[in-house]
Regions:
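Short, Lys/Arg-rich, polar N-terminal cytosolic tail immediately upstream
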Residues: 1-10
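Hydrophobic cores of alpha-helical transmembrane segments in multi-pass inner/ER membrane proteins
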Residues: 22, 67-77, 128-137, 196-211
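Internal transmembrane alpha-helix with an interfacial aromatic "cap," most often the third helix
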Residues: 4, 66-97, 137-145, 209
Length: 227
């Protein structure tokens, strides 16, 4: 029994670390967002997520930034486990790029929007690495024996759509986005795309953990049947 459990140690690292990244990230974002607004409404989505880490006007900025540090670290550990479990080239690319995403999330917690120049660089790194990561996930889905689920594929497509919108709106000279329209402040494409990318990545982490958990149970059941 000990040897069987040990065989799945790295799988369990992926399960727990990816779920932890999603839970911690969701808690930090939700608590900072609720503390910033007077009431829960659709207008919450017009607030850029990175503004929640501003120490000058966000009362829960510390919680938000610490959650980025913790969730990014958890996701990085999950990707280290992916790199060591799956030896094929595509999975290794996913692990490396996922590691870059994790590091960029950590750096966004270390350098929130108050450190504007550094924050712009690390947030651009997050955007680009997320785009490349989900592009490779699309390829991985059609690989024989892939553990990528349809839900993960759907979330990757959503992330790509949101990411490409942000990429088109990005001012490369400043590595930042233009302010929302003063005429139609209720329709801020930048904020909506940021929230869409953020939530898709969080749910992608959840699906990754649940997918590996299902794989463990299936393989264990097959092993017991053989015995």
């Amino acid at each position: 029994m000990t040897s069987r459990v040990r065989n799945y140690d790295l799988h369990l690292v992926i399960v727990f670390m990816s779920l932890a990244a999603a839970v911690i990230g969701s808690f930090g974002v939700a608590s900072a967002l609720i503390a910033k607004v007077d009431s829960i409404s659709i207008e919450m989505l017009m607030i850029r997520p990175d503004a929640l880490g501003n120490y000058m006007n966000s009362s829960f900025a510390v919680v938000f930034n610490l959650s980025l540090l913790a969730s990014g670290s958890c996701f990085l550990l999950a990707m280290v486990a992916v790199f060591n479990i799956f030896p094929d080239l595509i999975s290794r690319y996913i692990a490396v790029l996922g590691g870059v995403v994790g590091i960029s999330i950590v750096l966004m917690g270390v350098f929130p929007i108050n450190f504007l120049e550094l924050h712009r660089k690390v947030s651009t790194l997050y955007l680009l690495s997320s785009l490349v990561l989900h592009s490779i996930c699309l390829v991985d889905y059609f690989k024989p024996g892939s553990t990528m689920t349809k839900r993960m594929l759907t979330l990757s497509i959503i992330s790509l759509c949101s990411g490409f919108v942000l990429l088109m709106l990005l001012d490369w000279s400043q590595l930042d986005f233009s302010e929302c329209s003063a005429d139609f402040p209720q329709y801020c494409v930048v904020s909506l795309s940021m929230w869409s990318l953020t939530q898709a990545n969080i749910l992608w982490c959840v699906c990754l953990g649940l997918s590996l958990l299902k794989t463990i149970r299936t393989q264990q059941n097959n092993l017991y049947k053989l015995i």
